[in-house]
A protein has these predicted regions:
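Basic, Lys/Arg-enriched alpha-helical interface segments
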Residues: 1-51, 60-64, 71-107
Length: 107
């Protein structure tokens, strides 16, 4: 279970993202380098004695899709991001595949 202070900060960051959309920048958002998707970003916040990152991307419908989160404090930064990006890429691809399937069904 994610501690309440982390949930609160995640919700606050998600609300900022909803208000500002793709224009939200540092220190709240940064690009995730190494992703298979050029539009992969990370929400950045500190909470519960942790340094949290949430991988997300704006999909073709311009919705922000939050994909995976993790506390990078105390971890090898390289290993942390490799794992975060791999999971985010996989989940985002599944999301895009579902959108494509829905679009095909509507035709």
């Amino acid at each position: 279970m994610v501690p309440q202070p982390v949930q609160d900060e995640l919700l606050a960051s998600a609300k900022l993202l909803r208000v500002f959309g793709p224009q939200l920048g540092r220190p709240h958002v940064d690009t995730l380098n190494g992703s298979a998707f050029a539009n992969m970003k990370e929400l950045r916040f500190n909470a519960g004695d942790g340094v949290w990152r949430v991988a997300f991307a704006f999909d073709p419908e311009r919705s922000a899709i939050l994909l995976v989160a993790g506390d990078k404090s105390g971890a090898s930064e390289r290993r942390f991001y490799k794992s975060l990006i791999a999971e985010a890429d996989e989940r985002y691809q599944r999301h895009l595949d579902r959108l494509a399937a829905l679009k095909t069904e509507k035709k």
